[in-house]
A protein has these predicted regions:
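Flexible C-terminal active-site loop/helix
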Residues: 13, 35-49, 67, 75, ...
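Metal- or metallocofactor-binding catalytic centers and their adjacent structured scaffolds
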Residues: 36-44, 73, 78-146
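Catalytic alpha/beta core domains of metabolic enzymes, predominantly
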Residues: 251-256, 262, 266-268, 272-343
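N-terminal export signals
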Residues: 5-27
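N-terminal secretory signal peptides
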Residues: 1-2
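Conserved, mostly hydrophobic/aromatic
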Residues: 70, 76, 135, 148, ...
Length: 378
C-alpha cells in the first residue's frame, strides 16, 4: 500500500478527532519545492487583488488589497492557501513573506500534525495571523485531499444547513455609482452595509427607496459616542436591520456593553475579536462574534472559536476579508454551523484565481471536492 492510501485509511479516524479540527499567473513561487517525497514543501508568492468598486470605509478608502498565495506539496498532492491583508490587520506583503520565508515545513513528514505545526509557527513569531492562516488553509486542503473528503464532511456538518450570505455595499459619493452597487445586491437575501463614514443614514435610505431586503450593518468602529451608537441601533431596527457589527472602537468595551444592554439589535464583535481567548472576553459585551480566518490563524482555531461561542450562548457570524475563492471557500467549510455568513469577498474582486464557493439564490453552496473544495483556474 502506498503512502497516500495508507494515510487515507489509517489516519482518517485521527483526523476526525483532532480538530473538530507553478500555481498562479503572478509568476514563479518564491520558494519552489525541491524536497523529497514524504516531506512538506512550502512555496508562496505575493499578488494584488483588484476591487470591482472602491471601498469607502470608516477610516480609509481602498481599491486594491495585497495578498500572498501559498501552496504546500506532499507526496504528489498540493494544498492551496492564502493570506489577505487589509490595512487594519497590521500585516503586509513584506511581513507575511518574511515570516513564510523563515518556516521550514520540511521538518514535518505528517501533514495531519496541524496542532504541532501551529505551535512551531508560534515559536517562529507570535503574531502574523494572516500568514499563519495561509499555511493552515493549505494544510486543511492537503489533508482533506489525502482523505478524499471536504472538511465540512470531516467535521460532520450538513451542507443543507448553510446560511444565506450577505453582499456588501459601501457609501459612494457618486449617486450613479451608489445606485449601481445597490442594483448589484438584488440577487441576495441579505445586504451588508458598511457604515461609520459620515453618510450612514444616506446609504440605508438609498437602499430602502428600491428594496426592503434585510440588512446587517458593519460600523467599522466608526461610532465613538455611545449615545449616538444607541440612537443608530434604534434607527436601524426600524429599517429591517438584523444586527450591528463593531459599532464602537474595539478598546471601548465598557461603552459597547452599555450599548448592548439597551440596543434592540444584537451587537456583533468584529475587530474586537481575533483569537480563541477573545471569545470569552467578548461574552457579556457582545451578543455574537464574527470569525474570520485571517484573524483566527485559520480553520483549526476558527472551529474551536465557533464551538466555544455556541457553548456560551452566543451567535456566530462567519466573515471574510477581500479574498480569492481560495480563502472564502475554506471559510465556507464552517458555514453549516453558524447563524450568519458574510462570504462575498471573492465576489468583490476582478481577478479571482480559483473556482470554489457558489452562491445560489443567496445561499452559500459548498463544493463537494476534497479538501477546502477549490480548483485553480487556468
Amino acid at each position: 500500500m502506498n503512502r497516500r492510501n495508507f494515510l487515507r485509511t489509517s489516519i482518517l479516524g485521527t483526523a476526525l478527532a483532532m480538530s473538530p479540527v507553478s500555481f498562479s499567473a503572478f509568476g514563479e513561487p518564491t520558494r519552489p519545492s525541491a524536497g523529497k517525497s514524504g516531506r512538506l514543501n512550502l512555496s508562496f508568492q505575493p499578488y494584488e487583488l483588484k476591487l470591482r468598486h472602491a471601498f469607502n470605509l470608516a477610516k480609509n478608502q481602498r481599491t486594491t488589497t495585497p495578498g500572498v498565495q501559498v501552496q504546500i506539496e506532499y507526496d504528489g498532492l498540493i494544498g492551496y492557501g492564502e493570506a489577505s491583508m487589509p490595512p487594519y490587520l497590521g500585516e503586509s506583503v513584506q511581513s507575511v513573506t518574511e515570516f513564510l520565508g523563515k518556516l521550514d515545513l520540511s521538518r514535518f513528514s505528517d501533514p495531519f500534525r496541524i496542532e504541532d505545526i501551529h505551535a512551531y509557527m508560534d515559536s517562529v513569531a507570535p503574531a502574523n495571523r494572516a500568514a499563519k492562516a495561509s499555511v493552515d488553509i493549505a494544510l486543511h486542503d492537503l489533508t482533506g485531499k489525502i482523505m478524499g473528503q471536504p472538511w465540512y464532511k470531516i467535521w460532520g456538518l450538513n451542507p443543507d444547513n448553510t446560511p444565506n450570505t450577505s453582499y456588501t455595499i459601501s457609501y459612494q459619493p457618486d449617486p450613479a455609482e451608489m445606485q449601481r452597487e445597490i442594483d448589484e445586491c438584488a440577487p441576495f437575501r441579505v445586504v451588508k452595509v458598511k457604515m461609520g463614514v459620515g453618510h450612514d443614514k444616506e446609504i440605508v435610505e438609498a437602499l430602502r427607496r428600491t428594496s426592503d431586503v434585510p440588512i446587517c450593518v458593519d460600523a467599522n468602529q466608526g461610532w465613538s459616542d455611545k449615545e449616538h451608537a444607541l440612537e443608530m441601533c434604534h434607527w436601524l431596527a426600524e429599517r429591517n436591520c438584523l444586527f450591528v457589527g463593531q459599532p464602537m472602537p474595539k478598546e471601548m468595551i465598557d461603552e459597547t456593553a452599555w450599548v448592548r444592554e439597551r440596543s434592540p439589535l444584537p451587537i456583533v464583535a468584529d475587530e474586537f475579536l481575533q483569537r480563541l481567548p477573545d471569545v470569552q472576553r467578548a461574552h457579556g459585551a457582545y451578543d455574537a462574534i464574527n470569525i474570520k480566518l485571517m484573524k483566527s490563524t485559520g480553520m483549526h482555531e476558527a472551529y474551536k472559536m465557533a464551538v466555544l461561542a455556541k457553548a456560551l450562548g452566543m451567535k456566530v457570524m462567519l466573515g471574510c476579508m477581500t479574498e480569492t475563492s481560495c480563502a472564502v471557500t475554506a471559510a465556507a467549510q464552517l458555514s453549516p454551523m453558524v447563524d450568519w455568513a458574510d462570504l462575498d469577498g471573492n465576489l468583490l474582486i476582478a481577478n479571482d484565481r480559483f473556482d470554489g464557493i457558489k452562491i445560489v439564490d443567496g445561499k452559500v453552496t459548498i463544493p463537494d471536492r476534497p479538501g477546502i473544495g477549490v480548483e485553480l483556474l487556468g
